């Protein structure tokens, strides 16, 4: 939906549940959700919160060691930020009451053996996809941006694909895997690619072609249903939105807000190009995957792939060019100054991956990384 021409944006964040003393993951999702329901932190958007109305909801995910929050749709970044802060606070309170801590990291730094949530759909996923499902303790941040029609959605999807790797780099927050440095800034991206429907796509051209591809993936068993269409960007099967799914869950609320602002501007810019009849960029899925791999590997610390020019460029240069490209839409929503400040802050303090590695480097202890993540998850959400 839109309000006075401004597209709404909503954010889903997935979190790991950890023992704050032993620093290991805990299969506590059901206890956390039970406490959340008791305190008004679960259920549909708009549930009661001790400090006001909780602007969103909490839910279970594939594994018992994680929970997911979902904000209500907003037109203003301030409103969205307030929603995300409230949800993190509510989830952290519920987690603490259940004896665990909330951790905004896209992979758990310590060794883990996740367990599947006992729901028929998730148990079927385990049976159909084996180790891919059993090891899938990863946490993403998904952004829903309102669209006016399915035609506009596909037109925008086809045109925004070359810029998605920039969002991967900016949100990288998963350098550790099973207790060791993975060598990647976003190792979640690599783990996620195991799913047969995950990753970059070619251009679809029309809703009919999009539907044909989705139907074929389901009929061949690559996906059990629409919910397992794990494209980098997909048409939501619940809401009139495009859902951008490339990002790690962000360590801080500020980074989540920056992601949402850029995602909305990206969709709006691509939709404007579609409406104007501008051609779809001729970029092969293989090159989209290569750009995503490099963003996953280095974050914003090295060079990224400039798909338009076909060369490697410094990460900051490509980020600045991306922000300039979506600049008219940022100006239209009044977000230009806020985004500029958030980008500067991101490069000044580093991505979540940079901060996790810095915590480890001080003493060489993975427990310090977990402590940092727990602290940073709720620092911006403090009353």
Curated annotation (Swiss-Prot):
GO biological process: modified amino acid biosynthetic process
Similarity remark: Belongs to the glutamate--cysteine ligase type 2 family. YbdK subfamily.
Organism superkingdom: Bacteria
SUPFAM superfamilies assigned to the protein according to its UniProt record, in alphabetical order: Glutamine synthetase/guanido kinase
Function description: ATP-dependent carboxylate-amine ligase which exhibits weak glutamate--cysteine ligase activity.
GO molecular function: ATP binding; glutamate-cysteine ligase activity
Official protein name in the record: Putative glutamate--cysteine ligase 2-2
UniProt xrefs under InterPro entries: GCL_type2/YbdK_subfam (IPR050141), GCS2 (IPR006336), Gln_synth/guanido_kin_cat_dom (IPR014746), YbdK (IPR011793)
Region (Disordered): 35-56
Signal sequence residues: none
Reactions that this protein is recorded to catalyse: L-cysteine + L-glutamate + ATP = gamma-L-glutamyl-L-cysteine + ADP + phosphate + H(+)
Entry-linked Pfam families: GCS2 (PF04107)
Enzyme Commission number, as recorded: 6.3.2.2
UniProt keyword list: ATP-binding, Ligase, Nucleotide-binding
NCBIfam families the record matches: gshA_cyan_rel, PRK13517.1-1
Major enzyme class: ligase
